[in-house]
Amino acid sequence: MVQKKSQVSKIITVEQIGSPIRKPKIQRLALKGLGLNKMHHRRVLEDTLCVRGMIAKVRHLVHVVSEN
């Protein structure tokens, strides 16, 4: 049997600080992909390249609260 290495994935907490009203559709979809839809809501996500890319697209609408 092949044993999988247990990886401790990093966690990132993101808070929405801006409204997606009158923003391009790609930015609204990035917020939806992050699981954010209302102001001041927070999500705890895995720190992956995909998540980092979505945060980069909406960096003016979100705030990274903590990185562990």
From Swiss-Prot:
A cellular component annotation (GO) from this entry: large ribosomal subunit
NCBIfam families, alphabetized: rpmD_bact (TIGR01308)
Stored SUPFAM superfamilies: Ribosomal protein L30p/L7e
GO biological process: translation
Lineage of producing organism: Bacteria, Pseudomonadati, Pseudomonadota, Alphaproteobacteria, Hyphomicrobiales
Keyword Ribonucleoprotein: yes
Oligomer status and interactors: Part of the 50S ribosomal subunit.
Official protein name in the record: Large ribosomal subunit protein uL30
Species in which this protein is naturally found: Bartonella bacilliformis (strain ATCC 35685 / KC583 / Herrer 020/F12,63)
A molecular function (GO) term: structural constituent of ribosome
Similarity annotation: Belongs to the universal ribosomal protein uL30 family.
This protein's encoding gene: rpmD
UniProt cross-references to CDD domains, sorted A to Z: Ribosomal_L30
Lineage top rank: taxon: Bacteria
UniProt KW keywords: Ribonucleoprotein, Ribosomal protein
UniProt cross-references to Pfam families, sorted A to Z: Ribosomal_L30 (PF00327)
